[in-house]
């Protein structure tokens, strides 16, 4: 068998998420069907992260196996031909060892959350960034974010449906910058809990609005109680940037 690693970008707006589900459109389904159309092989695509409905990706990584060898550049062209009706595309493909696994071989995952912070909404970024009209205090958000760096119990920031066995995660990066009217939150970790990034962003926005003091983030973290954390930020502002191996 030949194992291929592909790097994918997609707009999550019209997808029910990455993972194949009965009765709804998923990124995994569209790609698996495209691969079948040119290879005549039923494959299972394994992704580095299972993005939720509405979440976008710039560098999602996945792998699949084929029984016959095909040039990687031909795979890129073939997949992109068959996924043309959808907001998804492959921009890299390479042959990898059969020991490689897109999910389990990953040592770090990187996300960015985009906020448009101005008095009027953005037409261009509709469904691609969270619009917040009230000014956000970036310095306060940065101070609050520092409490989340490192290894912690992130129970307060996981969804009620999270299936992870442990709430202990290690944030290796949480960087907040402002570029003109856009605020970008860069968040990295080896792995995440379900809704963890969006729940963190929702809480940091409360700090940015001066509803919370920065120190409240530490109180929320220590409480290990989802009910006292902030709201879940909208899915459409979140982007899976890359996985590292």
Curated annotation (Swiss-Prot):
Q: Is Oxidoreductase among the key words of this record? A: no
| Residues at the active site | 52
**Molecular function terms, GO-annotated:** RNA binding; tRNA pseudouridine(38-40) synthase activity
Query: Is Zinc tagged as a keyword?
Result: no
Catalysed reaction(s) here are: uridine(38/39/40) in tRNA = pseudouridine(38/39/40) in tRNA
Gene3D superfamilies according to UniProt: Pseudouridine synthase I, catalytic domain, C-terminal subdomain (3.30.70.660), Pseudouridine synthase I, catalytic domain, N-terminal subdomain (3.30.70.580)
Its assembly, as annotated, is:
Homodimer.
**Family classification:** Belongs to the tRNA pseudouridine synthase TruA family.
According to its UniProt entry, the function of this protein is described as:
Formation of pseudouridine at positions 38, 39 and 40 in the anticodon stem and loop of transfer RNAs.
Query: Entry's PANTHER family?
Result: PSEUDOURIDYLATE SYNTHASE (PTHR11142), TRNA PSEUDOURIDINE SYNTHASE-LIKE 1 (PTHR11142:SF0)
Q: Which NCBIfam families match?
A: hisT_truA
Please state what the protein is called.
tRNA pseudouridine synthase A
Q: Which organism is it from?
A: Rickettsia prowazekii (strain Madrid E)
From the broadest rank down, the organism's phylogenetic lineage runs: Bacteria, Pseudomonadati, Pseudomonadota, Alphaproteobacteria, Rickettsiales
Gene that encodes it: truA
